[in-house]
């Protein structure tokens, strides 16, 4: 076995790699409003923030479990609010999560069925699109 970047194993067993997805940046119009949505509706936790009051301000958030997070950033020439689409949150109990999100006032689609599993979609206050899903999505 060899050791690659950041001490991750390389080669060998399926699933070994030199990197993993860490953070996806999402442009939002109002970072404080977006933070409240991600905390209060989705249950995300704030993991860090910086450069407040500048065009480079960011807030790092992540779901209660999992290894990847999202960074709420200010709009810029390359990223505008509402452009991030299809980000997926995997769950083991889609009915329970769907009901909980509806109870919090979130506009969410009915649960649908696809060849890979069951899903529902919603958008954050800036129009960035999310999917909650259960099924054979493991990579």
PLM segments and residue spans:
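Conserved beta-strand in the GNAT
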Residues: 70-73, 130-131
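Vicinal oxygen chelate
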Residues: 29-32, 64, 80-81, 85-129, ...
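Short secondary-structure boundary/capping segments
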Residues: 16, 49-51, 60-63, 76-80, ...
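Flexible, glycine-rich phosphate/dinucleotide-binding loops
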Residues: 53-55, 67, 79, 136-139
């Amino acid at each position: 076995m060899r050791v690659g970047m950041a001490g991750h194993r390389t080669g060998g067993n399926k699933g070994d790699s030199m990197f993993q997805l860490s953070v996806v940046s999402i442009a939002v119009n109002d970072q404080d409003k977006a933070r409240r949505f991600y905390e209060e509706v989705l249950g995300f936790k704030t993991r860090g923030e910086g450069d407040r009051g500048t065009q480079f301000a960011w807030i790092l958030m992540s779901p209660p479990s999992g290894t990847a997070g999202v960074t709420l950033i200010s709009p810029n020439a390359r990223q505008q609010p509402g452009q991030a689409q299809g980000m997926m949150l995997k769950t083991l109990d889609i009915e329970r999560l769907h009901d909980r999100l509806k109870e919090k006032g979130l506009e969410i689609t009915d649960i649908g069925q696809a060849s890979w599993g069951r899903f529902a979609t919603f958008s954050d206050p800036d129009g960035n699109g999310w999917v909650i899903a259960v099924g054979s999505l493991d990579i």
